[in-house]
Amino acid sequence: MGRMHAPGKGISQSALPYRRSVPTWLKLGPDDVKEQIYKLAKKGLTPSQIGVILRDSHGVAQTRHVAGNKILRILKAKGLAPTIPEDLYFLIKKAVAIRKHLERNRKDKDSKFRLILVESRIHRLARYYKTRKVLPPVWKYESATASALVA
């Protein structure tokens, strides 16, 4: 899928493994994988970071095939899921960083423009998550309280 505010076409993507069965050489069972997920989530890692660690350190290509569920669903069942979705969280974090930069460099017009683009992406994504009932309907992004969300 193409980028929203950039000229890139975004053709590159990772390929999913063809076989959906669990590899025979994998020593971890479904319960072991879930325990690893819980342990890493309690350390404060995001679901994508957990997936990368499971892939690189433990050889779990797709958690869904081994454990029977996606990482975020496993975390939701245990009550360890993040309050706001990961992609929205990182957009808010980026907006806070740009605002902090603009406090020091008031004349930076390009950063001011990029902040507008990032915040429009935040509003669009928040609207999507409200319709999917991931966020509460009264949730609103405000730049004044944004730094408290990502701290």
UniProtKB/Swiss-Prot annotation:
PROSITE patterns attached to this UniProt entry? RIBOSOMAL_S15 (PS00362)
GO CC annotation: cytosolic small ribosomal subunit; nucleolus
DNA-binding recorded as keyword: no
Q: Name one GO molecular function term.
A: small ribosomal subunit rRNA binding
Sorted alphabetically, the Gene Ontology BP terms of this entry are: translation
Q: Which InterPro entries match?
A: Ribosomal_uS15, Ribosomal_uS15_arc_euk, Ribosomal_uS15_N, uS15_NS1_RNA-bd_sf
Give the UniProt keywords, A-Z: Ribonucleoprotein, Ribosomal protein
Source domain of life is Eukaryota
What family is this protein classified in?
Answer: Belongs to the universal ribosomal protein uS15 family.
Q: Which NCBIfam families match?
A: PRK08561.1 (NF006331)
Q: Would you tell me the protein name for this molecule?
A: Small ribosomal subunit protein uS15
> Coding gene?
RPS13
